[in-house]
Amino acid sequence: MDSAYWSYDNIVPSFRLDGKLVILTGGSGGLAAVVSRALLAKGADVALVDMNLERTQQAARDVLQWGEEQMKGKYESPIGQVSAWSCNIGDAEAVDLTFKAINEHHGKISSVLVNTAGYAENFPAEEYPAKNAENLMKVNGLGSFYVSQAFARPLIQNNMTGSIILIGSMSGTIVNDPQPQCMYNMSKAGVIHLARSLACEWAKYNIRVNTLSPGYILTPLTRNVISGHTEMKTEWESKIPMKRMAEPKEFVGSILYLASESASSYTTGHNLVVDGGYECW
């Protein structure tokens, strides 16, 4: 091998995302709050997408303010742009129009998609309302496909590479007892296999598709759920080998790895589980 092969830039992967546009769905949520800051710190422009425009706009302002306070003087490159968009990812036409508008607004084609949008709800299987089941599958399942499809089309048309990161769940591969979440479990199992299917189809276009499957995360929503329910938190943590729940920041490294073309150029169709060892037991 020649000296170029052994050069620093060739051997040591960069996690910089300078000049790249990242679409982050579920953009006003707890996981997106920390992910968006990390993406901005790595040089990316970030488009936050969520149902509630007002909350998403506030999230965008918060990220930019954080960037101005935390990044000033640390990097030569200017702070990237952060935009906010309202979209129901369960509506294919709305997703397509929104993603086109994002690319036009930023003057570039997005090359990274992080889909954190989705939700869970508890119903005993025999009592699960059909409408609720349909709505959950439309957002978690079809929504994951719609955003992937709208993201990939311009990349394929322009012969560009890209990375799709779909948020799965450990509930996509195991039954997370005792929560009665059969439809959520099914939706996340579908997301994991969707990523594998798209990875195989789009490998010829150099579009990588992976899932990141978290365990229990201490998002603001989760903190509210367990507030005043010490026994619930204790039960959850007893099933985790690391004996604690995860902070949202503990998923940032995994997302940056999957987003980075130099770090994960040969990783596609993979389900990266970050659960503190929960699935080992």
UniProtKB/Swiss-Prot annotation:
Entry's EC annotation: 1.1.1.250
A Pfam family it matches: adh_short_C2
Gene3D superfamilies to which the protein is assigned, alphabetical: NAD(P)-binding Rossmann-like Domain (3.40.50.720)
GO biological-process terms attached to the record: arabitol metabolic process; carbohydrate metabolic process
Signal sequence segment: none
List of residues binding NADP(+): 31, 52, 184, 188, 217, 219
UniProt entry tagged with the keyword 4Fe-4S: no
GO MF, one annotated term: D-arabinitol 2-dehydrogenase activity
UniProt keyword NADP, yes or no: yes
Chemical reaction(s) catalysed: D-arabinitol + NAD(+) = D-ribulose + NADH + H(+)
InterPro entries the UniProt entry points to: NAD(P)-bd_dom_sf (IPR036291), Sc_DH/Rdtase_CS (IPR020904), SDR_fam (IPR002347)
SUPFAM superfamilies according to UniProt: NAD(P)-binding Rossmann-fold domains (SSF51735)
Pathway in which this enzyme or protein is active: Carbohydrate metabolism; D-arabinitol metabolism
EC top class named in words: oxidoreductase
Keyword annotations from UniProtKB, A to Z: NADP, Oxidoreductase
Active-site residues annotated for this sequence: 169, 184, 188
PANTHER family: BENZIL REDUCTASE (PTHR43008), DEHYDROGENASE ARBD, PUTATIVE-RELATED (PTHR43008:SF14)
Protein family according to the UniProt entry: Belongs to the short-chain dehydrogenases/reductases (SDR) family.
Entry protein name: D-arabinitol 2-dehydrogenase [ribulose-forming]
